[in-house]
C-alpha cells in the first residue's frame, strides 16, 4: 500500500520510541484524556437520553398530549378527519381542574370524562364490556388512582365532593364553584404521580358540570406517537384552539433538556483540556526533531509536506483516543445496568439510550479539535530553516 510520504513519516514518528520521555508522556496523557473524555461524554449523554425518554413515557403517557377544540362544543358522534400521520387517534374528551373533598382530606387534581376505557392509557386495562357498569351515564361515578384514594381516605363505594373552580353558580350567599357528589366505583393502580391527582368519569357527567350538553364534548384528545411533535400540530389545525401537555409539564422537560445540554458542555471540557496536550507534545516534538526536519527538507521534502507530517501526527493521537473512547463508551453504556448493580447492589434502575447522531457529533467534535490543535505546531515545524538547524550538527 502506497502512503503519502507525510503520512508515512508521521506513522514512523508515532510508533518510534522517542528519547524525549517527557514529550512521550505528554502525548500518552493526551490520548488517555481523549479516551476518558469521549467515553464519559457518550455515557452521560446516553443516560440523559434514557432519563428523558423514561420521563416522557412515564409522565406524558398519563396526561392528554393535546386537546383540539372549536369555539363551540363538538359532537361526540363526529370524528376528527384528516389526522396527521404522527397522531395515533383522536377521541372526544371533557376535562377540567377540580378540587376533591372528603371528610378525611382535600386535594387538587384533574378529572377526565371518557366514553370508554380505551380513551385513556391509565384505565385501558379495565374490562371494556363493564364500562357502563363502572361509569354509567347519569350516576356520577368515579374511577380514581390508588394514591389519590390514600390522600382522601376513601375506598370503593365512598363519596367524594368535586368542586370545579373554573365554573361557578350564583346563590343567595354569592358566587360559589360548581360542585357535585361522586361515588368511587373503582380504583386504578400505579402509573407514577398521575394516580395521585387524575380521576375518570363518564364524559356526559363531566359535561353537565361544565355546562356542556349531552352528546357534546369540549374537544378532541389527540394521542401522538411522539409527544415532542406537538409543535407540528398548529399547521394541521390552523383554525382550532390547541391545548397541549406543555401547559402542565413544559417547564419540567425544558429543565431536563437544559440539564442534558449543560452536562454535555461540562464533560466536553475534558476533551478540550486533553486535546490541548497535543499542542504541547507536538511543540516538544518539533524542537526535538529540528535536525531531522532540516535533513528531510534538504532531500526534497517541501514545507507543506512538513506541515502535513505534524498534522497527521496530531490526528493519529486524536483518532486513536477518540476511537478507543467511543468503543469503551458504547460498551459501558450497554452494560451500565450491570456495572451500577456491581457498584451499588440496591436495585438502582438507570435507563440509557444510545443516539447514533450524538455519537457522530462527539467523534466529529473530538477529531475537529485534534485537527485544530495541530495547526500551530505544524506551522512552527514548516518555519524551520535547514541552514540554521544544521549549523552546529
Curated annotation (Swiss-Prot):
Keyword check for Transmembrane:
yes
Keywords of this entry: Cell inner membrane, Cell membrane, Membrane, Transmembrane, Transmembrane helix, Transport
Name the source's superkingdom: Bacteria
Q: InterPro entries this protein is in?
A: ABC3_permease_C, Lipoprotein-release_system, LolCE_TM, MacB_PCD
Q: Which Pfam families match?
A: FtsX, MacB_PCD
A single Gene Ontology CC term: plasma membrane protein complex
Keyword NADP applies: no
Q: What membrane topology does the UniProt entry give?
A: Multi-pass membrane protein
Which coarse location class describes where this protein primarily resides? membrane
Coiled coil regions in record = none
Transmembrane segments annotated in the record for this chain? 25-45, 262-282, 314-334, 356-376
What does the UniProt entry say about where the protein is found?
Cell inner membrane
Can you supply a Gene Ontology BP term from the record? lipoprotein transport
Task of the protein: Part of an ATP-dependent transport system LolCDE responsible for the release of lipoproteins targeted to the outer membrane from the inner membrane. Such a release is dependent of the sorting-signal (absence of an Asp at position 2 of the mature lipoprotein) and of LolA.
Give the family, as the similarity comment puts it.
Belongs to the ABC-4 integral membrane protein family. LolC/E subfamily.
Protein name in the entry: Lipoprotein-releasing system transmembrane protein LolC
Q: Which gene encodes it?
A: lolC
